[in-house]
């Protein structure tokens, strides 16, 4: 691949001849300032206020979830989702090694042990085939609970991720886990605006979590959301994330261990403004992805594109290079020339704090780790929009 030509193409695409092009920077072009000023003028800048309730309502409507509970970040959302799935200290939670560390950290926050199972190359998400093989070889049912025969620990949950906003084979994963009485928690942190078979990601399992970090498709500066269609889970999620405080006009009564995971109203105000612009952001990002796909096909480079029945938000565009040497050369030259690119995350099982946890053969994840590069994916300025 001609890297210099690719840098020139990206600069032309973003209309930036010399300036630094980040991977994904936020765009503020709507009611952000107006809503922030309202928070300040009314003094409702903390965890109670109009925009907290409105943001939850609007995200629920957009995703089709019956309940949406806002949190201070996506990691907290996953932590609470695991707790509400019944995960306890000493349990095992199956997940993928190819993920951002928040996925694995949330498992450890819940006191559980991550078990790393391989991914599919075409989704970069948890592989149902690898999951099925792992469970056939290692799991047994004891009553209505699943146990790991080798460790004698309960396998309570499975947390696949929709990588870069692309759908994993979530229906197959849920079907397998249902047979083994394993709860599924959907890590849809990167997937706001992504659909599979017309259904928003994060709403297939009983509970899921999304993120509104500063680099996401829409941002609240920092933030996350728990999605569920289960009334009991939805109400309990709200209770736990607000310090488990029993409603009362003046008394402070708490009935269980809760968490200060509340999103401030001032952050939720940003979220409401961003959600109003989401459809435009998605159309803009899709046009960018289509331009990339056409360009890289001519270069003989694989562009990570959506599959059949999938409508991806293209949060972060990715290309798959031929080997690690080619990947490293691309990373070095693009970043040196002010066009940001990055490798995919280092596999979780390679990190010192996770290296001794159980894992399967991870050949696909290792193959992708050596080849995947993310390229600029933020909303472009097109005709002043």
Question: Where in this protein do the model-derived segments appear?
Answer:
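Structured binding elements
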Residues: 111
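Active-site phosphate-binding strand-loop segment of PLP-dependent enzymes
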Residues: 122-220, 225-227, 232, 374
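PLP-dependent aminotransferase class I/II
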Residues: 9-11, 54-57, 65-66, 118, ...
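Phosphate-binding glycine-rich loop
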Residues: 45-92, 106-108, 116-118, 140-150, ...
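Conserved coil-to-alpha-helix start sites within the AMP-binding
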Residues: 99-104
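N-terminal "arm"/small-domain region of PLP-dependent enzymes with the aminotransferase-like
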Residues: 1-45, 376
């Amino acid at each position: 691949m001609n890297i210099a030509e690719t840098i020139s193409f990206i600069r032309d695409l973003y209309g930036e001849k010399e300036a630094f092009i980040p991977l994904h920077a936020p765009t503020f072009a709507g009611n952000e300032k107006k809503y922030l000023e309202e928070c300040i003028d009314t003094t409702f800048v903390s965890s109670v206020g109009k925009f907290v309730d409105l943001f939850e309502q609007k995200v629920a409507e957009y995703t089709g979830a019956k309940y949406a509970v806002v949190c201070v970040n996506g990691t907290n959302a996953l932590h609470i989702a695991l707790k509400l799935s019944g995960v306890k200290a000493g349990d095992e939670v199956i997940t993928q090694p190819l993920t951002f560390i928040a996925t694995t950290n949330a498992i450890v926050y819940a006191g559980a042990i991550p078990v790393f199972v391989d991914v599919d190359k075409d989704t970069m998400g948890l592989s149902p085939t690898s999951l099925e093989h792992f469970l056939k070889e290692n799991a047994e049912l004891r009553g209505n609970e699943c146990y790991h025969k080798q460790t004698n620990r309960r396998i309570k949950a499975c947390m696949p991720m929709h990588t870069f906003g692309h759908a994993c084979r979530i229906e197959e994963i849920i079907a397998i886990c249902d047979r083994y009485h394993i709860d599924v928690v959907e890590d849809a942190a990167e997937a706001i605006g992504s659909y599979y078979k017309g259904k928003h990601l994060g709403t297939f399992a009983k509970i899921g979590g999304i993120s509104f970090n500063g680099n996401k498709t829409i941002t609240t500066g920092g933030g996350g959301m728990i999605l569920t269609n289960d009334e009991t889970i939805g109400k309990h999620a709200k209770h736990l994330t607000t310090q488990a405080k029993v409603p009362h006009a003046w008394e402070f009564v708490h009935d269980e261990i809760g968490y200060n995971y509340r999103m401030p109203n001032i952050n939720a105000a940003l979220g409401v403004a961003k959600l109003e612009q989401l459809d435009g952001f998605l159309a803009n990002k899709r046009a960018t992805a289509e331009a990339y796909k056409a360009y890289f096909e001519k270069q003989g480079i694989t562009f990570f594109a959506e599959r059949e029945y999938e409508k991806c938000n293209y949060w972060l565009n990715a290309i798959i290079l031929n080997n690690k040497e080619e990947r490293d050369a691309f990373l070095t030259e693009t970043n040196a020339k002010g066009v940001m690119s990055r490798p995919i995350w280092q596999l979780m099982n390679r990190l010192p704090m996770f290296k001794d946890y159980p894992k399967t053969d991870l050949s696909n994840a290792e193959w992708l780790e050596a080849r995947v590069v993310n390229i600029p994916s933020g909303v472009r300025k097109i005709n002043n929009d």
